[in-house]
Amino acid sequence: AGPMVNAINGKERLSGYQAALAEAGLTFSEGLVFETTYSYPAGLKLAERVKASGATAAVVTDDEVAVGLLNGLVNSGVNVPEDFEIITANNSVITEFTRPTLSSIEQPLYDLGAVSMRLLTKMMNKEEVEGKRVILPHGFVKRGSSK
């Protein structure tokens, strides 16, 4: 879930999702990819679409959307994580304020900014930049929304 209009984020995430499915021997289903805006109300509306799809889990790219999705599903009688699991991607403080708490991918946001600034400074100084793709360490914080 999240907007696909940003060519860098949306398309890269979708490509990574498709690659992970292929690596696991699973088939990609376009009907299980939901595009939405980054907001709590969008997450509430998303709950209806996700429930109707028959999906049993979601990876959401924004914590606010994930909270809306969680509340929308719980309000409609879905048991999380027993019947539906949710993982979000920013590990902001709101992931700990929900019931159940939201499992999250932990991203090194400070390091992301620092590395980006170093690369930008090198480019501005017309210095050589080796590889423009940097993969930083990340982790998974298991909480109550996943088994």
What is each residue range found by the language model?
Residues 1-147:
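Bacterial carbohydrate/catabolite-sensing allosteric modules
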